[in-house]
């Protein structure tokens, strides 16, 4: 009994092993819980960041899509440099730092931005639905190059599917992707749009990114013509869109 009594006579010796074990387990559980919470918070932050970027990406895509429906109405004349080259002349915008070759007899105008930084239109003198427009959109710091929107194939699919309303009842505009490719920092996308009962429109876009020294800007150059105008305008419009470059 004498051998046992020292262990029993000490409440500290009696209780500490159990308390130590319990506290150890409790601490381990708390540490694990904190670790899970930290991981959860980090994951929520990552998801929130992705959602934020995703929302801004969708906003930009909506602006790109809306630029497609621009029509050269109620515009004011704009100055164009006339460095003639055969049937084309070079239009230079020193403010927005770009130049583009347009058909010699086409008119130039500025439209109300309406959410854009700038919209410039080029179109024939005669009555026509053919035109080329350049819409400039401001971008946040998350977008530093075209790949920020994903690969060109996915970008094109998202853009065109966002325009398609053929699934609606009654049926809306039908949008079909024809081709997409990336070249020298630009995304080139070719597709068609057709409203019920109207002529099909062919659209050819060049989309690129540049900075003015303060923030990034997205330039969407879109040329369009109908099936009826295809033979006359197709080559002109594609040449015009492809000639766009930053200065």
Curated annotation (Swiss-Prot):
Q: Where in the cell is it found?
A: Plastid, Chloroplast thylakoid lumen
The molecular function terms in GO held by this entry are: calcium ion binding
For this record, the Gene Ontology CC terms, alphabetical, are: chloroplast; chloroplast thylakoid lumen; chloroplast thylakoid membrane; extrinsic component of membrane; mitochondrion; photosystem II oxygen evolving complex; thylakoid; thylakoid lumen
Q: Which UniProt keywords apply?
A: Chloroplast, Plastid, Thylakoid, Transit peptide
- Give the chief site where it resides: plastid
Q: What residue stretch is labeled transit peptide in the record?
A: 1-26, 27-80
Biological process terms from the Gene Ontology for this record are: photosynthesis
User: Would you tell me the protein name for this molecule?
Assistant: PsbP domain-containing protein 3, chloroplastic
- Output the SUPFAM superfamilies linked to this UniProt entry: Mog1p/PsbP-like
The induction field says:
Down-regulated by photosynthetic redox signals.
Q: Which family does it belong to?
A: Belongs to the PsbP family.
One Pfam match, given by its short name, reads PsbP
Which InterPro entries has this protein been placed in?
Mog1/PsbP_a/b/a-sand, PsbP_C
Q: Which organism is it from?
A: Arabidopsis thaliana
Determine if Transit peptide is one of this entry's keywords: yes
């Amino acid at each position: 009994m004498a051998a046992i009594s020292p262990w029993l006579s000490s409440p500290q010796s009696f209780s500490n092993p159990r308390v130590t074990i319990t506290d150890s387990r409790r601490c381990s559980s708390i540490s694990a819980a904190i670790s899970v919470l930290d991981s959860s918070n980090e994951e929520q932050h990552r998801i929130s960041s992705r959602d934020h970027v995703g929302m801004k990406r969708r906003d930009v895509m909506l602006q790109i899509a809306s630029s497609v429906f621009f029509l050269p109405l109620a515009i004011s004349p704009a100055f164009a440099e006339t460095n003639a080259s055969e049937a084309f002349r070079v239009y230079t915008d020193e403010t927005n730092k770009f130049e583009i070759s347009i058909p010699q007899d086409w008119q130039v105008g500025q439209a109300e931005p309406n959410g854009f930084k700038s919209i410039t239109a080029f179109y024939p003198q005669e009555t026509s639905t053919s035109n080329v427009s350049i819409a400039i959109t401001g971008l946040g710091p998350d977008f530093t190059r075209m790949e920020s929107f994903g690969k060109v194939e996915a970008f094109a699919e998202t853009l065109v599917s966002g325009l398609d309303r053929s699934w609606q009842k009654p049926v809306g505009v039908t949008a079909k992707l024809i081709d997409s490719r990336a070249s020298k920092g630009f995304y080139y996308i070719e597709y068609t749009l057709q409203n019920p009962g109207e002529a099909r429109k062919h659209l050819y876009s060049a989309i690129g990114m540049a900075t003015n020294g303060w923030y990034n800007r997205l330039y969407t150059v879109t040329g369009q013509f109908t099936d009826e105008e295809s033979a006359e305008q197709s080559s002109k419009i594609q040449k015009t869109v492809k000639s766009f470059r930053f200065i």
